[in-house]
C-alpha cells in the first residue's frame, strides 16, 4: 500500500518546480532521468507574466512528459518577475514538435493579445538537422544510395543518405545527404557544387543546403500571394475598363464643376480651402488622359504624340496643383488642354505619358477628405468615382514607382506617419513572415500609400501579425477595406478596418 505524500514533501516538490530545476514531472515515470538524445529545448513566448511553472506544466503535459520548465525572470526586481516567456524540455522530440504544432501561432492564453510563440531555443539551432542536410541535384539516375555515400563520405560522417524516387521506384535524379555537423556539410558544398557533370545529366551537379520547412512555407505563401495579387490587379484593370465606358459622363460633370458659375456650389464643402478651380480642372484632364490610355491599349499606332506628353507633363507640375491665386477664368482658359486630350481617343499613349499619370498624387488630399453638403453630394459622388478609377489605374500600372523610396523615408523618420482622418487602416492576422515591403505591395493598388508598417515584438524579434497602412485620402482607405477585408493568405483571413480616431476616447 502506497503512503500518501507528506505536506513537507509536497512543498519541497513545489519549490523545486518553481525554481526551474530539472525535476522529473508527472507522466515521466516511464522515462529515464534524462531526456532522449534528440530531445529539443523549446522557447515559448506570449505567456502570462502571472503564470508559474505549475500552470505551464498543465499546458504542456497533454502533449507529452515534461522534463524541465524554466520561466525567464527579471532578476533586477524584488521578487524577480516573469518576463512572459520560458524554456520547456520534453523527454521526447516527438512531444515537443506536437506541442509546437498545436500551440505556435494558434492558441492564445488568457489575458494575452497574441498567440503563443513556440520554437526551438537558439542553443538547439546550432546542430539542428535542417542545418546539416544537403540537397544533391543533377545526380545520374544510375546512382544508388551507396554511390552517393562513397561520393560524399570524404567530407565527414553521414547520418542519412536518401535518393528521391518516383512511384515507379526509379530515381528522380536527386538525393538528400545529412552530415553529423554543419561544418562537414559546408565543406561538401565547397568541394562538390558544380564540380562535375554526371552521366545522363545536362548540367553540373548541384550541392546546397536543403530547404527548411520555413523556407517551403514562405515560398508557398509568396506564390499564393502573387496569384491573389494578380487577381486583384485583373480586377483593377476591369474597373479601369468600366471607367473608360463612363468617361463622357464624368467629363461632363467635371467640366461643369470647373465652370465659373458652379464654383460657388463648393463654398459649403468642408476642407476644400486648398482645392481651387485649376485643381478640379486638372482632375478632369486626368480623367480624359485615362480614357486615352485605355483606348491606346488596342491601338495599332505605336508612335507616342508629343502633344500628349506636354499635356500630361503639365499635370505633374506642383505649381499648377498648388497655386493659391488661380482664378476661375484661368481655369476655363486651360480647358483647351482637355479638348486636346479628348481628341486622342484613337492614338497610342507612350510609356512616358502613362508615367506622367503619377502626378495624380498631388490631388489625393483634397477630394478624398471632403465633407459634403446636401446640394453637392450627387455631383461629388460621381467625381469621387472617377477619381478612384484613375487612382487605381495609376497604382496598377506603376506598382514600384515609390515603394522603395517610401520605405526608406519611413525608416529614416523612425515612426508611423499618419494620413488624414479616415485614411489610416489597422490590419490584423498578417502572416508571420510578412514585413513592411509585403504589406506595402499588398495595399498599393488602392491609392497613394504614405506609410506601411508591420509591428515587431522587441523581445522575440518576431512579427506581432498586425500592422498599419496610411493613405493620403479616405477614398483609398475605403477601397482597400472593401477589397482586402477577409482576403485569405495561407490559413489566415485579413481583418482590415479603420484605425480608431484619437478623439474617439475623449468625452467632449
Swiss-Prot record:
Tissue expression pattern: Expressed in frontal cortex. Isoform 1 is expressed in brain and lung. Isoform 2 is expressed in heart, brain, placenta, lung, liver, kidney, skeletal muscle and pancreas. Isoform 4 is expressed in heart, lung, skeletal muscle, kidney and pancreas.
All residue ranges annotated as the RRM domain in the record: 40-123, 132-212, 423-501
Main location, first listed in the record: nucleus
Taxonomic superkingdom: Eukaryota
GO cellular component: cytoplasm; Flemming body; intracellular membrane-bounded organelle; nucleoplasm; nucleus; ribonucleoprotein complex
Outcome of substituting residue 507 to S: In DEE97; mislocalized to the cytoplasm
Span list, region Necessary for RNA-binding, TNNT2 exon 5 and NMDA R1 exon 21 inclusion: 1-283, 357-508
InterPro entries: CELF1/2_RRM1 (IPR034196), CELF1/2_RRM2 (IPR034198), CELF1/2_RRM3 (IPR034199), Hud_Sxl_RNA (IPR002343), Nucleotide-bd_a/b_plait_sf (IPR012677), RBD_domain_sf (IPR035979), RRM_dom (IPR000504)
UniProt keyword annotations, A-Z: Cytoplasm, Disease variant, Epilepsy, Intellectual disability, mRNA processing, Nucleus, Repeat, Repressor, RNA-binding
Subcellular location: Nucleus; Cytoplasm
GO biological process: mRNA splice site recognition; regulation of alternative mRNA splicing, via spliceosome; regulation of heart contraction; RNA processing
Entries under CDD domains matching the protein: RRM1_CELF1_2_Bruno, RRM2_CELF1_2, RRM3_CELF1_2
Pfam (any one): RRM_1
Gene3D superfamilies on file: 3.30.70.330
PANTHER family cross-referenced by the UniProt entry: RNA BINDING PROTEIN
Disease: Developmental and epileptic encephalopathy 97: A form of epileptic encephalopathy, a heterogeneous group of early-onset epilepsies characterized by refractory seizures, neurodevelopmental impairment, and poor prognosis. Development is normal prior to seizure onset, after which cognitive and motor delays become apparent. DEE97 is an autosomal dominant form.
Assembly notes: Interacts with A1CF.
Family: Belongs to the CELF/BRUNOL family.
Function as written in the Swiss-Prot or TrEMBL entry: RNA-binding protein implicated in the regulation of several post-transcriptional events. Involved in pre-mRNA alternative splicing, mRNA translation and stability. Mediates exon inclusion and/or exclusion in pre-mRNA that are subject to tissue-specific and developmentally regulated alternative splicing. Specifically activates exon 5 inclusion of TNNT2 in embryonic, but not adult, skeletal muscle. Activates TNNT2 exon 5 inclusion by antagonizing the repressive effect of PTB.
The protein's name: CUGBP Elav-like family member 2
Originating species: Homo sapiens
Name of the gene: CELF2
